Amino acid sequence: MNRAVCQVALENDEREAKNTWRLVFRIAILLLTVMTLAISAAALAYSMEASTPGDLVSIPTAISRAEGKITSALGSNQDVVDRIYKQVALESPLALLNTESIIMNAITSLSYQINGAANNSGCGAPVHDPDYIGGIGKELIVDDTSDVTSFYPSAFQEHLNFIPAPTTGSGCTRIPSFDMSATHCYTHNVIFSGCRDHSHSHQYLALGVLRTSATGRVFFSTLRSINLDDTQNRKSCSVSATPLGCDMLCSKVTETEEEDYNSVIPTSMVHGRLGFDGQYHEKDLDVTTLFGDWVANYPGVGGGSFIDNRVWFPVYGGLKPSSPSDTGQEGRYVIYKRYNDTCPDEQDYQIRMAKSSYKPGRFGGKRVQQAILSIKVSTSLGEDPVLTIPPNTVTLMGAEGRVLTVGTSHFLYQRGSSYFSPALLYPMTVNNNTATLHSPYTFNAFTRPGSVPCQASARCPNSCVTGVYTDPYPLVFHRNHTLRGVFGTMLDDEQARLNLVSAVFDNISRSRITRVSSSRTKAAYTTSTCFKVVKTNKTYCLSIAEISNTLFGEFRIVPLLVEILKDDGV
């Protein structure tokens, strides 16, 4: 039993010893933990320079500052978002359009320069500003429904005058001719001793392009010009813009018009060109072959047109009696009638007078014939000339004129030198270097003054040599490309060359007008051309007009510029 008691006592002692060391271990661990925390806190405070509780007052201020910075950053991000939207939605499409225009401009320029290099022209072709690409020689207003006369010209706009004026009282500048395609070409005649002198004159010829000023204004920039002051008396010149420069057709005159019609040989003619390098060259045409049936032959004064690698000029003059060309027209005539104003004369009498209208007494009874001359455009001037004589069952008595191309359509304007006063535009088709004319568009309110019995209101066939050159420019088209209306500047008087007004015309009536000056201001020839600034979608028309200028010369040639507006109430 004592042994058992001893065994129990020994186990109790061992248990107490274990508990004592366990307590010591726990206390030691606790002390080490507290020391570790204290050391760590001291180290952290030292490394971060921890603030005292009194410093916590500045924390709200710091938070407020941080909030301000975050708000500012968010505002900056909104600005960036706004700029991105503006760039994507607004600026990028405009930049893309401008890039497209520049590329098209470059392609056009490169095309002409390649052509010039191939033809040894020695100079690249200038081109219009990109703003005009797609706006020259195109159908500018395509509208099936609006009243044509709801389109009307603005007041005349100030722009750079690219036409030289007389500098003395006896100086005379007359007979302007203008054409525009890849460039624009202009020419007029210069006489030092009054407008009626036929013995000697100069010919001014210029080449240029359309520009847009920094403020958005349209202006015509002259890049090359020459004054042909030599022994050659060039008259009745027509000009055309071609891929090689400004091509010009002139007659060389040594006598009056009446004397020329009474002669037996054709009038000398010359084909010239002002190149992009500023050099002018010309070549005499073989008129004895080309105009063998003619006694007098002149360019139509109005511009020509570049079509199918050829330049097409209007021509008119007198046929040699009994020549093949003359006999081929014998008995042929056409009668055009005024709108809602029928001639009261007997039909047989009208036919007799219509036939006689082709042989006016002023030119000795010679048949005055309309024609069109085409010349191949190459470095060789006067190459492959082809003369087309349209039948007088389509055309009236031969007169000054103009060949125009608008879109894919070609037209011949014929001055109303005969009995028919309203402006005429013959649709023209070309094939195998020759032209075919078709029944004309007529514009009843677009008249010209004339001597009785062929005054502005005339309605019956008669034999006359009268009128004035005032060409219409095709402006408003149907969607099927047929012509609806034209722009032009006319002399609004029965008999006198007075009262210059601009308007848009349909086949019957005209729009509101823009008057050049007072109704008593003298004027003469006008030639008009329209174009569009594609960037702004604004349509402009240029009328080059001879206007009386009593201080310096009898006439001053003035380029009148208008914008075409729309009256939405019509």
From Swiss-Prot:
Source superkingdom: Viruses
Virion surface compartment residues: 49-570
Membrane topology: Single-pass type II membrane protein
Any Pfam family hit: HN
Catalytic reaction annotation: Hydrolysis of alpha-(2->3)-, alpha-(2->6)-, alpha-(2->8)- glycosidic linkages of terminal sialic acid residues in oligosaccharides, glycoproteins, glycolipids, colominic acid and synthetic substrates
Protein EC: 3.2.1.18
One BP term from GO: virion attachment to host cell
Subcellular location as annotated: Virion membrane; Host cell membrane
Subunit record text: Homotetramer; composed of disulfide-linked homodimers. Interacts with F protein trimer. Interacts with host CG-1B; this interaction inhibits viral adsorption and replication rather than internalization.
Domain notes: The C-terminus (head domain) is involved in binding the cellular receptor.
Protein name: Hemagglutinin-neuraminidase
Origin organism lineage: Viruses, Riboviria, Orthornavirae, Negarnaviricota, Haploviricotina
Gene behind this protein: HN
